[in-house]
């Protein structure tokens, strides 16, 4: 478990499923991610992937909740999704974050991602990447605040996306 001033990051549990499902089925939340709300089955598969990442890679996604009242904020973490993307990213951990609509605009994404990155830095991971839809200005700002810089563009699912990279702080 990781704690910040306002947040608690922990591995997803079965009890997180309903909150995760509600968030990923919200069209406003997924607008710049896939553009298509997730079904209950797709959210279930996501929860299984999140847990499986930890066993296979030693890192993965955390469930983010507020410390004050335990309210579900969203998901943040890292994966090797083996994306069909040009240029390929090999096995570099890819950061990702998504927040429930109520949590937008409160600095939670930056706070959670900074904590997750500190965890990765502590494990000696030299660099991470993230991909962001060019029109998603909010996520671009979060990435910049967390030390990501524009590496270039990439083609993912036939669309151009921004490819950002971050180097470990203590190198």
Question: Could you describe each region identified by the protein language model?
Answer:
Residues 38:
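Donor nucleotide-sugar recognition loop
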Residues 51-63:
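A short helix-loop-beta-strand connector motif used in the catalytic cores of GNAT acetyltransferases and
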Residues 35:
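Active-site beta->alpha N-cap acidic-glycine motif
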Residues 1-32, 48, 63-171:
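Acyl-donor (CoA/ACP) binding surface of acyl/acetyltransferases
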């Amino acid at each position: 478990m990781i704690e910040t001033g306002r947040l608690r990051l922990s591995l997803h549990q079965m009890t997180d499923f309903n909150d995760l499902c509600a968030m990923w089925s919200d069209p406003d939340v997924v607008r710049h991610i896939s553009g298509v709300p997730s079904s209950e089955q797709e959210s279930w598969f996501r929860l299984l992937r999140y847990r499986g990442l930890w066993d296979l890679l030693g890192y993965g996604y955390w469930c983010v909740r507020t410390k004050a009242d335990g309210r579900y904020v969203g998901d943040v973490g890292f994966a090797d999704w083996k994306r069909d993307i040009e240029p390929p990213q090999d096995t570099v951990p890819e950061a990702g974050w998504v927040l429930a609509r109520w949590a937008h605009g409160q600095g939670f994404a930056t706070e959670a991602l900074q904590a997750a990155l500190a965890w990765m830095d502590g494990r000696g991971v030299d660099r991470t990447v993230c991909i962001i839809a060019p029109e998603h200005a909010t996520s671009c700002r979060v990435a910049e605040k967390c030390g990501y810089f524009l590496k270039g563009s990439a083609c993912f699912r036939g669309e151009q996306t921004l490819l950002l990279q971050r180097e470990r702080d203590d190198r």
